[in-house]
Amino acid sequence: MAVFTPSYPLTFPTVSGVRTQRFSLVRTVAVSSSPFTGQDQVVQHEGEYWTTQISFPPMLKDKAAQIIAFLLQLRGRRGTFSIGDQDRKTIQGVATGTIRVNGASQTGNQVALDGFANSTNNVFKAGDYIQINSFLYMVTEDVTSNSSGEANVKIEPALRQGIETIADDATVVYSNTKTIMRLDSNETAWDTDQVSKYGISLSATEAL
């Protein structure tokens, strides 16, 4: 018996667009409050990851079949797919051309980049997404390049230390940015009504 395994991550289907999307960043923060003083002890752990919940618009069976086939190929939580914030596929900033990582083995909530136009304001703006390797980050402050086309870019979440290797000159994606996710459930289900309109939704978490 031949066993076919899809090549993951799968490409997210575009046959219908999405009706609604919730996109969120989850952090692992422990808070312990003293019962005597009321003071908090706060510890932020390394775990940070994107999640999404998507609802597709009502559709007839020809389009629904393509969405369902995509979901079934994921085989529950086994497979992965690429997706980003569907309402933020382009940046607000003025960056053009090829932007690259400026220096290897970077860590933390700031990444040095180069390849910008020299001495330019707002090459990225707060709220823009960038993608390094297969991981997604949001720029948290407007960015101005220096006279050499370099800039230090503040981001959330922090660079994925221990998961991702940041190589010097790695290309930075800033259009149609994505990360890799897997479904939150092993069940694949859909609804239909009396006129064969399909209702399909999914929930997924970044695959780290």
Model-derived regions, located:
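Extracellular/virion structural assembly segments
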Residues: 1-208
